[in-house]
């Protein structure tokens, strides 16, 4: 008689027979590549709402030294103009992230994945150094460049989704208001007409340079690496958010019919439009970037 033994059973995901019968491939994990105020939050929240397209978050924004995303003044570290800096909240201390690189990766993968195995996340170009630093602590590295780092952290078969905004001035105005108010998410509440944010051409100009450079860097990276990617413009996303999300779902091998109505509302208002027009006029007169 065999001795009694306790067995630990590990659950294994069942094969998706619908995909097998239809000839479709398994759905792909993905990374949204963007810059701040480009509309990427609307896209990832739409994908999250499907419950099958990962739980995309901006996982790479948190600084290991503080466990916080960059604070308003950290966006302006090279700026010495006190009329700009005085409009931004002072730095607040944080708590150092003591997780190992492997612990950080494992948690990131667990949180970002839906039960069907699809992982989703979002990366801004200014966060690339954080990705490289985190990946440097992983064992058995495949290389030290960004593509290797993403492969070592995430997956070798990632789909890349590039979200961009043609009107960088409007994007910078949106970010300039956000760094002052520290309200980054759109919701059902209309923006307050007097939210405490103040117009400053040099503050906006600083962000125009940053945001324009971020998009240039993404485009250069895709070209240099020869990476196929999905291009999503802010204009298309805002004009037809549900249809745009459906397009992305198809590209990921998921059901387009799962695309939800837009879960967020735009924060832009008449005040932002006034600032955009004012900045364009002052930029033309004073040689500020457009």
Give the residues covered by each predicted segment.
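PAPS-dependent sulfotransferase catalytic core
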Residues: 2-115, 266-271, 275
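Aromatic-acidic/polar surface patches that form glycan- and anion
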Residues: 25, 35-36, 113, 127, ...
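Short coil/turn segments at beta-strand junctions that form active-site/ligand-binding loops
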Residues: 26-28, 115-117, 156-158, 227-228
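Hydrophobic/aromatic beta-strand patches that form the interior of the parallel beta-sheet core
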Residues: 30, 54, 119-121, 159-163, ...
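Surface-exposed, flexible loop/turn segments at secondary-structure boundaries
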Residues: 40, 61, 126, 168-169, ...
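The conserved 3'-phosphoadenosine-5'-phosphosulfate
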Residues: 63-71, 187-205, 219-290
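Short, conserved catalytic or adaptor-binding loops enriched in Gly and charged residues
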Residues: 110-112, 152-153, 220-225
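PAPS-dependent sulfotransferase catalytic domain
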Residues: 120-219, 242-257
